[in-house]
């Protein structure tokens, strides 16, 4: 339902060798750190704003209700803007079924109506209905006040964006910049995920380091976050846990993302709200032999794009070099960070080192699988079953790990590559165990150690 940043990272190993300093790809600036409303239009000097959503344990129902109510005026504004440009906006012919929904029955009957009209494929309609019930059960389990209203308002907007994506499919470029207007997809994702996070049982490890990252980025340094990957909600969890202290991080992070998040109709609206470096997953590279060459060329373009961005400096890139989401131990049921692909780590390191700008690599750990647990095994087909839950989440970062410090005694490049990857993985795993103790074993900040200090920056 939201973003799957899975096996994209392993693809770095496939294409990085082709990235050269001669690449000439447009450089995209960092997104603004200003929190905007969900809908805005550049018609005049005046913009239409909705209030930023800052609730700690729940969602602003009023803001989402206003979003639905303001869609009529947004369509009118879009018409005016596009008529001036001589264009016909997709919103003109867009069905209002979900925009007009005010109840659960309206939403469910709307899915049926759109499917019968041929505007929703049967499999997409079935996935939307399943998602509705799973999301509703998760939000209601939070015990938040007006949870029913939250579900209807959030799902009406989500369904509207999914339907629009089917009617007028969005095409992602190798580097996709988060769409912030006229519809603010970034805030849309936050509003949707926020009610699923139990902030009372969520923690950030070494929060001060994230503030240091922001300072370095503003000075033109490149930062790469090497972490595990747990769920489709990972990018939103990172942003929401840092929202009170470091909103700059959430808005400017660029995620190396697999192709499935930009093709699944239920994922695409959420993907549109993130900065993505889009690649084809190594795990799915050979699903269709006829497409292998096309996928490799596309990955080369994406890696050139990344190299160009790094040369401009001031970049924040998140990559999960395991090549996919973590899975539980089949024997014990315990979750743990999946092992890293050493080649992916090494190629990312070389891209940073050869960029010409100061660069730093930090190990980061995520614990949030209960929010949207992945299927037990990697699936070939698009359209996985999406479970949703209300749970505590965790995010932790450790100090930078320097390649030369770790590999000083290594006797070969191969040994050095493996040693560096293992050093990063060891740190991620150590942080994960501390987050697990705090959240799953309910130890809270008492789970802190000399290396990982847990806190709740939103309190």
Curated annotation (Swiss-Prot):
Residue numbers covered by motif HXXXXD motif: 229-234
Keyword Transferase among UniProt keywords: yes
GO biological process: CDP-diacylglycerol biosynthetic process; phosphatidylglycerol biosynthetic process
EC number: 2.3.1.15
Domain of life of the organism encoding this protein: Eukaryota
GO cellular component, one term: plastid
Biological pathway: Phospholipid metabolism; CDP-diacylglycerol biosynthesis; CDP-diacylglycerol from sn-glycerol 3-phosphate: step 1/3
Molecular-function GO terms, alphabetical: glycerol-3-phosphate O-acyltransferase activity
Entry keyword set: Acyltransferase, Chloroplast, Lipid biosynthesis, Lipid metabolism, Phospholipid biosynthesis, Phospholipid metabolism, Plastid, Transferase, Transit peptide
Domain remark text: The HXXXXD motif is essential for acyltransferase activity and may constitute the binding site for the phosphate moiety of the glycerol-3-phosphate.
Matching PANTHER family: GLYCEROL-3-PHOSPHATE ACYLTRANSFERASE, CHLOROPLASTIC (PTHR35695:SF1)
Family that this chain belongs to: Belongs to the GPAT/DAPAT family.
UniProt protein name: Glycerol-3-phosphate acyltransferase, chloroplastic
Gene behind the chain: ATS1
């Amino acid at each position: 339902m939201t973003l799957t940043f899975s096996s994209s990272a392993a693809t770095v190993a496939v294409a990085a060798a082709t990235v050269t300093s001669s690449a000439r790809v447009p450089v995209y600036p960092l997104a603004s750190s200003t929190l905007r409303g969900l809908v805005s239009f550049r018609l005049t000097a005046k913009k239409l704003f909705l209030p930023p959503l800052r609730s700690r344990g729940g969602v602003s129902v009023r803001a989402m209700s206003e979003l639905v109510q303001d869609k009529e005026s947004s369509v009118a504004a879009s018409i005016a803007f596009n008529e001036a440009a001589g264009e016909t906006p997709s919103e003109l012919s867009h069905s209002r079924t979900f925009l007009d929904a005010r109840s659960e029955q309206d939403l469910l009957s709307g899915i049926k109506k759109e499917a019968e009209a041929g505007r929703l494929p049967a499999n997409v309609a079935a996935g939307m209905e399943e998602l509705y019930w799973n999301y509703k059960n998760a939000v209601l389990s939070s015990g938040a006040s007006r949870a029913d209203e939250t579900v209807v308002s959030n799902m009406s907007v989500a369904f509207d964006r999914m339907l629009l994506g089917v009617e007028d499919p969005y095409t992602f470029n190798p580097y996709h910049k988060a769409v912030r207007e006229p519809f603010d997809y970034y805030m849309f994702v936050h509003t949707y995920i926020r009610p699923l996070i139990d902030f009372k049982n969520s923690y950030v490890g070494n929060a001060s380091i994230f503030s240091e990252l922001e300072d370095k980025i503003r000075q033109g340094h490149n930062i790469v976050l090497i972490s595990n990957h747990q769920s489709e909600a990972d990018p939103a969890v990172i942003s929401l846990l840092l929202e009170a202290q470091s909103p700059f991080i959430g808005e400017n992070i660029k995620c190396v993302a697999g192709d499935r998040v930009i093709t699944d109709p239920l994922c695409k609206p959420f993907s549109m709200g993130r900065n993505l470096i889009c690649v084809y997953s190594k795990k799915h590279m050979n699903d269709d032999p006829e497409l292998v060459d096309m996928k490799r060329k596309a990955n080369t373009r994406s890696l050139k794009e990344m190299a160009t961005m790094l040369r401009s400096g001031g970049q924040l890139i998140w990559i999960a070099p395991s090549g996919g989401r973590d899975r539980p131990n089949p024997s014990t049921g315990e979750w743990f960070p999946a092992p890293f692909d050493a080649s992916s780590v090494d190629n990312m390191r070389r891209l940073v080192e050869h960029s010409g700008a100061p660069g730093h690599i930090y190990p980061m750990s995520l614990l949030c699988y209960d929010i949207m647990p992945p299927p037990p095994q990697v699936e070939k087909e698009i359209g996985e079953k999406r479970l949703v839950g209300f749970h505590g989440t965790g995010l932790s970062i450790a100090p930078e790990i320097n390649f030369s410090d770790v590999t000083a005694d290594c006797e070969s490049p191969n040994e050095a590559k493996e040693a560096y990857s293992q050093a990063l993985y060891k740190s991620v795993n150590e942080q994960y165990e501390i987050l697990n103790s705090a959240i799953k074993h309910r130890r809270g900040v008492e789970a802190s150690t000399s290396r990982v200090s847990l806190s709740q920056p939103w309190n």
